[in-house]
Amino acid sequence: MNPIKKIFFDFSSAERRWFFIALAVLVISTIAEIALAIKENGVMAPIAGGSYREGFLGQPIAINPIVSNNPTDQEISSVVFSRLFDLLSAYEISPDGRSYNLKLKEGLRWDDGQPLTSDDVIFTIKTVQNPEVRSPFMKSWQGVAAERGSELQIKLGLPLAYVFFLNNIKWLPVIPKHIFGAIPSENFRLSDYNLEPVGSGPYKFKDFTKRKDGFISQYHFVPNENFAGEKPYIKDFYFNFFQNSEDLYQALKRHNVNGFGSATPLSFNLSGIKGVTEEKLPMPDYYAVFFNQNSNPLLKDKNIRAGLVSAIDKKRIVDKVLGGNAAIVNAPGFSSTDSMNGNDSDYNQDEAKQLIMAFKTKNKNEPINITLTVPEV
């Protein structure tokens, strides 16, 4: 008989019991030591794979970042297209601030395998400058001259120095000339490539699902092997679309989608959905009314302007229209200081009446007519 077995069988019942207890303690303590060593010295690293489904209300219209003007299109475009600044290996600004020399990274390619060169960048700039395209980037690129230095180099010339022009470069998405170059500007928004995009971002278009009534229910994207940046870990990225808040709510409740993002208030409470965490992220957007004193002489009067400001109940707008998902801003731009932001409002109905009446008394009850112009969205 094996000596170890002989010793074990020579144990009494009590000795065997204590042997197993000691063995269990040894195993548990060893596992605990290993776990502690991993926790203190190990490095957690993500692995590639899996899928993610993002829910959206509404429909994609044009997954083309230089014509997109709605949040759905813009968010989808952000995973398909790269911004100009992210494609650069270097840039130089002239001492007078009017010339920018840009150099692209070597070996850039679109997700269909075609080379991405300075021709694509120049084509993008000239396209956004074309008024027939109606690009939201048009104003920020007006008057900018773009010249080809080489396959990788672009020279930009500004009519006047603009200290924030580098931000224009950082935010400009680049579109492929070999896809859109032959499309007339008047048909630019009608191209099928706006729904089957070719880009250079972290993900590339694979397919979409459309119902018989024309409603697009899902987009499917996969990692772009030609992406110049850090490769994404998620293997399959889906965008799922819903016609109303109730459908989105039910999909979230059944875990048919992993999450959603919305800049507009929704008709349901997320606290009623098990396993869902709500994260509120501040967005660099604001709603404001600007006084155009040139188009309406009435607005040159300080009492009128102050009266209009006092007459607007910002807190009620935040609570009733935006569902409390906003902060009151009392000055242009953004700041984290309490004097600029917070829940304080200039609303004072009595003061507004006094200011308006002071103007009317001064101007012999002159009628007050003001036109409010809003963007078409």
Question: What is each of the regions a protein language model found here?
Answer:
Residues F56-Q74, Q114, F164-I175, F290, ...:
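A structural "hinge/loop" feature
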